[in-house]
Amino acid sequence: MEPFQAKLTMAALKAAENVDAYFASLAEELFQYYVIQKGKTQYWLTDIEFYLYHKQRRDIITYPRNCKAGEWFFHPSGVDIAFESFVRKEGKKPTLTDDAFFGGILVRGIQKKDPKGDILFDGPMLACEELFDKFDAFEEVENFPKLVRVAQALPYEKPEPEKRFNLKKNAEEKVSSILANNYEPLRDEHLKDELIQAYRQFWDKEYRYKRYSR
């Protein structure tokens, strides 16, 4: 397993003494030492957000998933570099249980490196559509985007982290919507109250990182 990929496993995330500091270290390594390679074209990450849900930190805004560490995970908001993730799925939708553990790094912005002038794709859907616009439905996929480590550190201005984009304060309404759209009915009627309290705890966490200060 690639060294950075190993840092996205459940074991590594559970071992982190301070998850906030761990997110910051992952962001720094991604910005400085990784590019997204698509064929002959390189993209620098410019804007990312972190999401992680498990029993001890119920950040319910996180999309549920079953993924290996480092997989691309597509969802209605764009694409994540996934953490190793598990959630039970016994029906059409996932079921929230105490052993659920899932999350990832949302790609919010990328910078296409071009000799004629770099092009910025600012926004998670713009970034996703640029990277994963089209691929052959019948032949082996060529030029599929992948994370590649570079030898020399890339520019990283290390601005202060920010609140994640566009999260709403109305906890009851937001949590109800998330549960209705993404999960089977809760088995524990008290869990919703816990999720609402957790949403209030996490909605303004500074888990958004940018490459540049501007």
Name the predicted role of every residue range.
Residues 1-214:
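A cross-family signal for N-terminal binding/gating loops and helix N-caps
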